[in-house]
From Swiss-Prot:
Originating species: Bordetella petrii (strain ATCC BAA-461 / DSM 12804 / CCUG 43448)
Binding site for ATP: G92, G94, R95, K114, D126, G127, R177, R184, D271
Protein name (Swiss-Prot/TrEMBL): Protein nucleotidyltransferase YdiU
NCBIfam families noted in UniProt: PRK00029.1 (NF000658)
Cofactors that this protein relies on: Mg(2+); Mn(2+)
Length: 497
């Protein structure tokens, strides 16, 4: 099904059908003289929208906030949360407007404008997003999708000359995000903290019925009842979150702001702010300049996710009195994360299966990379060339070339232990298929931002083409797979957007 126009989309408003306390209905505040910088045909196909529709005047009007989505009900949602480990109280969509929910060929997608003006939840904010951060978010979601990591998606990027004050005066933009749902851990925390169990139950029922209907069915040996459905939902959220963290860690991705209000109830990567894909590897790499204590450093992300899950579990305690049952569900996190992470790392190292004694091999590689500031992405990518008998490129990434070669010889010996079918070329090809050559490095995003400021979306097009299939080498694109230039070291990203 491909709709010729926005008016032909099948629009639902399931979140708007919740009681009024869950949101505020309001219209966006349109940008002045908006211009469509980019529209994503792949994301549009998810809602059955044709390429021609993306070039229509109506498309620009809807996704610049000038008119509502046909059939939609625009609103901003309320939620609360912990920010940097501290209870922040009520938060909510301070600059995001949910336009509606569209039925696509393979499922429903909510469409949300980010940067579309103030809402009752803006607190001290101005409701706007700047071009810089909007380009970064637009690219990041598509990059993560290309890596096979669950994420929200990007549909459109609209820009304007409207001034926005941050550290300096910047210009405004609106990025349209797509997700099956924007419900967060903080959505549950909100009602729990306010001691409103009826609203908490309504939210839980909405999430279970719409996204986890299988949780209504007792598993073998379980007694039926509402507590069981909630526990099964929590178990599924725990599984998805653990597997998401394994995906982040395996590609060297740092989110930067893992507050509970930025954690998706569907296990998606949500809210791309001061994120980063690591260049020089540090176990304790901090991508967010605002994170002075390193709470959200790369090596802390899995434990922070569990901490956040405990906040979600604590919110559900108002509905599930059995604390031990909640704890038992959350205790499954570490096993799930470890298994998922090892599966990913086994594939990256060219191992057919992970063994318990492979842990020192991986730990020693990460420590060696840390000590030598070796590039994360290229280290894993060049392992395949070493398997092909060309270890020099791998060694070039390390100050201690001999140590790098010695470690690789340990990996080669481990490969040899796998016995029959130990074909080097086939193994190397398998490694190339999971170790990306292209990731959204900060300097590549910065180049796209600079071009976008001049009204040129060419770099966005180029990056999207590479990032959608990041493991496949493209001719003439060596610069996009190279080590970052010296000037990239001066790029700082923070919570200011």
């Amino acid at each position: 099904m491909t709709a010729a126009t926005l008016a032909q989309l099948r629009v639902d408003n399931s979140f708007a059908a919740l009681p009024a306390a869950f949101y505020t209905r309001l219209a966006p505040q349109p940008l002045t003289a908006p211009r469509l910088l980019h529209a994503n045909e792949q994301a549009a196909a998810l809602i059955g929208l044709s390429a021609d529709a993306l070039r229509s005047d109506e498309f620009l009007r809807v996704f610049s906030g000038q008119q509502p989505l046909p059939g939609g009900q625009t609103l901003a949602a309320v939620y609360s949360g912990h920010q940097f480990g501290v209870w922040a109280g009520q938060l909510g969509d301070g600059r995001a407007h949910l336009l509606g929910e569209v039925a696509g060929p393979d499922g429903n997608w909510e469409l949300q404008l980010k940067g579309a003006g103030m809402t009752p939840y803006s607190r001290m904010g101005d409701g706007r997003a700047v071009l810089r951060s909007s380009v970064r978010e637009y690219l990041a979601s598509e990059a993560m999708h290309g890596l096979g990591i669950p994420t929200t998606r990007s549909l459109a990027l609209v820009v304007s000359d409207d001034p926005v004050m941050r550290e300096t005066v910047e210009t405004a933009a609106i990025v349209t995000r797509m997700s099956p749902s924007f419900v967060r851990f903080g959505s549950f925390e909100h009602w729990s903290s306010r001691r409103q169990p009826d609203e908490l139950r309504i939210l839980a029922d909405y999430v279970i019925d719409k996204f986890y209907p299988e949780c209504r069915e007792p598993r073998p040996g379980e007694a039926p009842g509402p507590d069981g459905a909630l526990l099964r939902m929590l178990a599924e959220v725990t599984r998805r979150t653990a597997e998401l963290m394994a995906g982040w860690q395996a590609v060297g991705f740092c989110h930067g702001v893992m507050n509970t209000d930025n954690m998706s109830i569907l296990g998606l990567t949500l809210d791309y702010g001061p994120y980063g894909f690591m260049d020089a590897f540090r176990l304790d790499h901090i991508c967010n300049h605002s994170d002075s204590e390193g709470r959200y450093a790369w090596n802390r992300q899995p434990s922070v996710a569990l901490w956040n899950l405990y906040r979600l579990g604590g919110s559900l305690h108002a509905l599930v009195p059995d604390v031990e049952a909640l704890r038992a569900v959350l205790d499954s996190y570490e096993v799930i994360f470890t298994r998922a992470f090892h599966q990913r790392m086994a594939a990256k190292l060219g191992l057919r299966e992970w063994r318990a004694d492979d842990e020192p091999l991986l730990d020693d590689l990460l420590r060696l990379m840390h000590d030598n500031r070796a590039d994360f992405t290229l280290t894993f990518r060049r392992l395949a060339d070493a398997v092909r008998g060309r270890p020099q490129g791998l060694q070039d990434l390390f100050i201690d070339r001999d140590a790098a070669l010695a470690w690789f010889e340990r990996l080669a010996a481990r490969h040899a232990q796998e016995g029959a079918g130990n074909d080097a070329q086939a193994r190397a090809a398998g490694m190339d298929a999971v170790n990306p050559l292209y990731v959204l490095r900060n300097h590549l995003a910065e180049q796209a931002i600079r071009a976008a400021k001049a009204g040129d979306a060419g770099e966005i097009d180029t990056l999207l083409a590479l990032l959608r299939d990041p493991c496949v080498e493209q001719p003439g694109r060596d610069a996009y797979a190279a080590l970052p230039p010296d000037w990239a070291g001066g790029i700082e990203v923070s919570c200011s957007s």
